[in-house]
Structures are given as C-alpha cells and as structure tokens.
C-alpha cells in the first residue's frame, strides 16, 4: 500500500495552498458562529441571518459540535464555548430523557418523535470529536451515544444500521438507507480511533461491503440509496419526490465521492491497526470516483456535479449542491494521497477551481449551498446555508493523513 504519496508539485504539498485552505476554513467557521440559539444551533439563511424564532435542530447542533471541536483542537479561539453550548443542548433539551436517544428538535417541538440512525450517527461523531478536544461532558455523551448505536441501531445479522424507530423504540422502519449507513461508517471510523476498539472497523467494513461492494458494483458503481428491510433495492423510491434532501429518487453521484473517500480511510485504518485489508477497498474507491466523475460532472452542458441521476444515469435533479463538491475535492485528495496518480491531481484542482468560481459566496459569506443548472444561486432543495460540516472538512482533509480520525489527526499536528 502506498502511503501518502504526493508529487512534489502537487497542491497537497504547496504551502500557499494549505494556507488558502486554512483561511477558507476560518471564513466558514466565522460565518457559522451566528447559528447559536438557546437550545443548540439553528440553520442560517443565505445572508447568514437567523430568525429570532429559528429553532435549534439536532443534526445541525451535532455537526457544529463536531466542526468547532476540530477547530478548537487546532487552537482557534472562540470555539470552546460553542462546543460546550452544543454539548449542553445534546445532553439536555435535544435528548429524550424518558426512552433514551435524541429527538430531531428540542423536546420534539416539531412533532417528530422518531429516532433516526442518521441523526444518532452525528451525535456520536460530535461526542467523539469533543472528547478528543477534551471538553467536559463529552465522555458521558459519547458513552450514551455508543450504547444507543449498539443496542438499538446496529443489526448484527444485517451488518448494517436499522433506519429509524418510534420514540419508544418500537415500530422499526422497514426501509434501509445507504445514506445513514454511509454516515454510520464515518462515525464508526472515528469511534475505532477514539475508543481504540477494532470492532468498529469490522462493522464499518461490513456496512461498506453491503452497500458498495455488493450493491453499487451492480449499478455502475453509483451507490444505490434505498432498500427494503431485506436489502432489496427500491428503484422507484421517491420517484414522485425526486429532489428530497435526504432520500432523493435515483442515484446520487455526490455519495459516490463520499463513499470513495471513506473506503480509503477504512483501508488505511485497518492497515494501521494490523487488521485484514480487502483489496476491493481501493478498487471500489477508484470505480466510485470514476463513475461519479463520468456520470455526474459536466453532464448537462455546464460545469458542476448534478444532484441525482435516473437508472440510465441521466440527470434528474440538475441542481449543484455544495456538499457534493466538498466531497468530490476530498475524494480526489484521498485518492491522490493513496496512489500518487496525476489524474487525481487534475480532478482535485478542477474541483477547487469550480468551488472558488461558483460556490464561494464572497458577498454574503460561506458557500452557496445550492446552484441551479446555470450555476446561479438557488434554494430548491436546501434553503439558506445551514451546513458547516461538509465544506469545513473539505478544507482539512487534504492536509491530513488517511488513517486516523480528523480530530485525532489534528491533535497530533499541534
């Protein structure tokens, strides 16, 4: 296995480029600080404003805790109070003190009392990063989140996460989602590192094998998103709601990039810990990246990555979402680190050129979260600018090794 192979003229080894990434990350952090509300963090509009009545939500809060933990570990001022604020919200109003787990909003004020794997994966990720940052209360939160993942969501017989439950943990949803298992894989990689337990890497491998090596390989290496409880694909799922923000119809090229990066992290982590490393991890990562580029990039007459494709790999929802470019650039960086092959340098520079030209909002701050097919700001799928996590990680990942969690890697660099 080639470890962190970088050409001498690569942007990955360029000090000015690394400084540019750092500066871009700082700008993103400064914008996101306005999202603080009494019970956690809320979503911001495209101007960086939040309404006085804007509610906190658990996914945003968990992602902010994770992101500000990464910043605090680097020694960036002003982040520790934000981490502690988010941890207090996750330990308090966002938590179900009766049945355990977390609501989507404080005290389930939005009426949604279901417990979702996607959300709980982010709570565990936030707690793990806050623990590395040494914040009070993070260890207790991490223990509780891990217990919920193990006792409620992890299905040993499936080698994957169950999707959701009713508030009292009855009514297990018959749907299985690649998206929640993808973020579960991300979280399990962090847990293996922070808890020093190989078990989480074995579970991550089982999820990746099911979703990617078994199913995506049969779909041109574009991840199939939706399955029934027996892991049979649901090709018509949300055909009448193709632009859903979490469960869109068809295939999602952006998730191909994201999975490609995660497979490389998994490969490196398993090698570092002396665990068996399947050859398909690298092979599938290459294929995922190639397919996402072939079918997602510049396929409708303009630059950018379309949100979704149909089963013939034709664009369905042509909006360009910011997280897809963040993940594309990070995947290119990971493959460049892993292989040293020049084509990944070309893609890495191409994606960041696009981000700089189209995504970065130099008038109001942060990144446009959505552009239409003419690369003009749009709010069809995602209103406002609620997300720090994807873009901020994109500024960090190219500067860090593949093998350990972001939080631990940043701590080692200090």
State each model region's role.
Residues 1-414:
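Glycan-recognition and catalytic cores of secretory/periplasmic carbohydrate-active enzymes
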């Amino acid at each position: 296995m080639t470890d962190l192979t970088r050409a001498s003229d690569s942007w990955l080894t360029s000090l000015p480029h690394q400084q540019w990434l750092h500066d871009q990350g700082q700008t993103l952090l400064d914008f996101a600080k306005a999202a603080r509300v009494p019970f956690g963090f809320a979503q911001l509009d495209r101007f960086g404003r939040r309404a006085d009545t804007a509610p906190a939500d658990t996914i945003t809060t968990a992602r902010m805790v994770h992101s500000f933990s990464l910043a605090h570990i680097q020694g960036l001022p002003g982040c520790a109070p934000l981490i502690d604020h988010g941890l207090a919200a996750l330990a308090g109003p966002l938590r179900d003190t009766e049945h355990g787990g977390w609501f989507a909003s404080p005290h389930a004020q939005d009426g949604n009392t279901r417990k979702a794997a996607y959300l709980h994966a982010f709570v565990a990720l936030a707690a793990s990063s806050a623990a590395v940052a040494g914040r009070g209360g993070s260890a207790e939160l991490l223990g509780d989140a891990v217990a919920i993942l193990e006792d409620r969501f992890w299905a040993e017989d499936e080698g994957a996460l169950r999707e959701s439950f009713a508030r009292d943990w009855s009514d297990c949803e018959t749907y299985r989602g690649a998206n929640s298992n993808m973020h579960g894989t991300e979280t399990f990689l962090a847990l293996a590192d922070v808890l020093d337990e190989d078990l989480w890497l074995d579970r991550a491998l089982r999820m990746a094998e099911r979703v990617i090596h078994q199913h995506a390989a049969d779909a041109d290496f574009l991840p199939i998103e939706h399955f029934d409880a027996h892991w049979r694909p649901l090709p018509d799922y949300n055909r009448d709601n193709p632009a859903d923000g979490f469960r869109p119809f068809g295939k999602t090229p952006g998730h191909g990039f994201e999975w490609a990066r995660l497979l490389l992290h998994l490969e490196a982590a398993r090698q570092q810990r002396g665990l068996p490393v399947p050859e398909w991890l690298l092979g599938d990562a290459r294929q995922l990246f190639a397919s996402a580029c072939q079918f997602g990039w510049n396929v409708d007459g303009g630059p950018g990555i379309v949100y979704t494709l149909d089963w013939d790999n034709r664009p369905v929802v042509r909006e360009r979402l910011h997280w897809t470019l963040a993940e594309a650039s990070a995947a290119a960086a990971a493959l460049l680190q892993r292989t040293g092959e020049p084509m990944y340098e070309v893609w890495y520079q191409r994606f960041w050129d696009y981000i700089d030209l189209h995504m970065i909002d130099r008038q109001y701050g942060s990144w446009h979260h959505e552009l239409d097919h003419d690369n003009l700001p749009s709010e069809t799928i995602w209103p406002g600018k609620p997300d720090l996590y994807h873009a901020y990680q994109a500024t960090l990942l190219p500067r860090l090794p593949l093998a350990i969690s972001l939080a631990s890697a940043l701590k080692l660099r200090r």
